[in-house]
Structures are given as structure tokens and as C-alpha cells.
């Protein structure tokens, strides 16, 4: 049998309501030289019947007899893949028709890039467009404090996946984030600066138990990156960076600790050159401005936080402070206009 250009790996567990739409979005791609590998992680609903209902020779169905988790299922699907490229897809999302054609064209034109993702448009519980950084050096920097890739948008080269697995033994939930970090330090990674997938937001996506596991594993990846940059890592620094990553780990941001950490990260990078200095500085400026502007209760507190750490001062932060200071004047002017 002729090997396809792209192998799409779709892992499913109890998604009977959404699976058909996800599969149809892949089988309807403008690039049709593909195979769709379904790895059913011991579903107990009608997902197996839905998967088998597609009369398309490009569909290959595999089933785990017991629930092994997403990382193990993903590794199984990749092991079965025969394509030159391997695309990831979730069982509740919708790939736009030209997604694979666009991504293959990008990787063909950029042979040094190991993988690429793209922007997503959410639907369901709420709607927004998630625009991620797209240049390789920016992605490498942003992985320090975020996950700037959406897993169901990823297209990888087979050569990238051949020597790696998704760390299923160490990471049950944050395996994708750990994988992107590993790859980014060896090969360039990228995003297409356009929407390639509709990402469904619904209540059944993640349980509280799974969320706790995800945060614990994310902390492990954050610690590893901090140790690589600073030469050491401690619980307080990891907790501060975790707050920046998820913005929900604590009710109030530990601004002094975060500011101190950002200053040490910037200084360490100037010595070690782990990241492009200008790009790291820009990312830290953005994060610091967002935290100070979002959590300082008053203009005076914003100025106090900004001025106490001159090493983190930026034009962006100065503009945010001025806007906050002018807010009462704007409110008074509008009130006078309506009087």
C-alpha cells in the first residue's frame, strides 16, 4: 500500500457526540493524501461505532482494551503512522478545510522547522480567536511562561517524532507541553499566523482531578526550564512562574516575588544566552505590565510597583500607568458631558 503524505492521529475517549464532526473535518481536507488513525482509549459510549461508520479506506481504527491515557494512546498512534508528516487532532475539534495543505506547504518551504501549529478560534462555551506567537525564537521564549501552541493544530515531521516519545511515563497530562519544550531547544518550531482549527470549549474537557495533575506536571516542566536558565530552581520561584503561566494558582499575584524572578531571569540570560535577549526581555515586559496593570488597585500602586523595579521598566508599562492615572479624569469628563 502506498504510504500517505500525512498521518493524522486522533485519540478518543467517550466523545460520541463530537467525534463524527472531528473526523469529517479531516477526511474533507483539501489535501487528501492522508490516513486518519483513530486510537480509541477504551471508550464505553458509542465512539467505536461512530469511528467505524465512516466508509473511507483512509480511516484506520485501533482500540486500547483498557484506558491507558492520552499520552500512551498518542504514542501508539504515532507508532502506527506511515506518513512523512504526522498531524495531531482532538476528538471534539474541527480542522478548517485547508489546514493540512497550508501546514505541509509551510514545512516544505522551511525544512529546518521541526513542527508547526496555528491559531485557533474557540466556539461553544465562549468564542475568541487565540493568536499565538509564530516565530521560532519567540515560541522558545514564551514556553518559559505559557504553552504557546495548541496541540490539535500541530503538524510534525516524522524525523522529529522518530527519536522521541511523548514522555508518557513521566507526564500523563502535560506531555505535549513537555514535548514542545524538548523540541524547541533542539530544532526551530513555528505557528502559522492564521486560524487553522475551531477549538470546542465545553464542560466535559477536563475534570478537577485532571486539572490538579496538569498543574503538578506543568510545575515540573517550568522547574526544568528555570534550572536550565538560572542554574538552580526552588519552590518559590516555580510557584511565581506558575502564577504567570495559569493566572489562577493563587487569588492574588505575588508581585514582589515575580518581579524579583523576572529580574534574575533577565540577568541570567544575559550571561548564559539561552534565549534571544531582546525577545526574552520583550516577553517579560509584556507579562510584567499585564500583572501590574491587572492587579494593582490604584494608579499610585501601579507607579509604586513599576518604580521599585527599574530593571523591568518599559514604555509599555509607562503607558499603562499613565492610562490608569488618567482614568478618573476621563470619567469626570464623561460625567460632565452627560450632565
Task: Indicate residue ranges for each PLM-predicted region.
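Cell-envelope/extracellular polymer assembly enzymes that use nucleotide-activated donors
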Residues: 4-7, 35, 178
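A conserved hydrophobic helix/loop-capping motif in glycosyltransferases and polysaccharide synthases
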Residues: 6-18, 22, 29-30, 39
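A conserved acidic beta->alpha catalytic loop
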Residues: 25, 32, 40-49, 66, ...
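Glycine-rich, basic loop-to-helix element that forms the pyrophosphate-binding segment
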Residues: 64-81, 102
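Conserved nucleotide-sugar donor-binding catalytic segment
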Residues: 79, 133-224, 228-245
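Short aromatic/hydrophobic "clamp" motif used to bind/position activated sugar donors
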Residues: 86
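Conserved donor NDP-sugar-binding/catalytic core segment of glycosyltransferases
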Residues: 98-130
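C-terminal subregions of glycosyltransferases and related glycan-biosynthesis enzymes
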Residues: 201-339
